[in-house]
Amino acid sequence: MSKAIVLDSHLKEKGSVELPKRYEGINSHNLYLYVKHYLSSARANTAKSKNRAEVSGGGRKPWAQKGGGRARAGSITSPVFVGGGVSHGATNKRNYNLKINKKQKRLALEYALEEKAQANKLFVVEKIAIKGVVEDNKRKHLTKEANQMFQALEQRDTLFVCLNMDEYTELAFSNLKKCLVIDVSELNAYLLAAFSSVVMEEAAFQHVVQDKTEE
């Protein structure tokens, strides 16, 4: 059974916690479907080209049908002319969103967590809170403290997951390129797959792994 690594306040390993048994044997195809759903939902349908009906001009026949030695033409909006309409061009009426049901979303999230745990890249800490130093009635050195926390993990990049994240913690990590801090309500399988390691607050971890199959 896969286990998440439990870290102490100094981010040193002090134990482990098992993932629920239902996380085992989940088909990886659920994660593939969720990633396609996530990326397609984020796609902006802005590409647009004009067809021959939308191009301006072309109200009269450019030259006589016969006698000129040239191929017949009825309008300069034809796709064969420079400046004419585009054949089979992009339209902004296509919906790229791919639907996925609630169960598949849950299975994708559970599979992604299981993968991180098997790779020893899933960590649990008691609290993720950056307070900084108060100077002149202002909180300073927030990013410095957040970077020290990230460096102590010795990971390539890290996703931090909090429960009821405060504004100082969010600000502290916002300037770090290889880190992202989110509230547990924003957690999804795509983010879990995108980052090489995940650090979760204990409360956030318990919130995620509780059985939601009967909800």
Curated annotation (Swiss-Prot):
Bias type Gly residues, positions: 56-71
Entry keyword set: Ribonucleoprotein, Ribosomal protein, RNA-binding, rRNA-binding
Superkingdom to which the source organism belongs: Bacteria
Pfam families recorded: Ribosomal_L4 (PF00573)
Segments for region (Disordered): 46-72
GO biological process: translation
A Gene Ontology molecular function term of the record: structural constituent of ribosome
One GO CC term on file: ribonucleoprotein complex
Role description: One of the primary rRNA binding proteins, this protein initially binds near the 5'-end of the 23S rRNA. It is important during the early stages of 50S assembly. It makes multiple contacts with different domains of the 23S rRNA in the assembled 50S subunit and ribosome. Forms part of the polypeptide exit tunnel.
Family the entry assigns: Belongs to the universal ribosomal protein uL4 family.
HAMAP family: Ribosomal_uL4_B
Assembly notes: Part of the 50S ribosomal subunit.
Protein name from the UniProt record: Large ribosomal subunit protein uL4
Lineage summary: Bacteria, Pseudomonadati, Campylobacterota, Epsilonproteobacteria, Campylobacterales
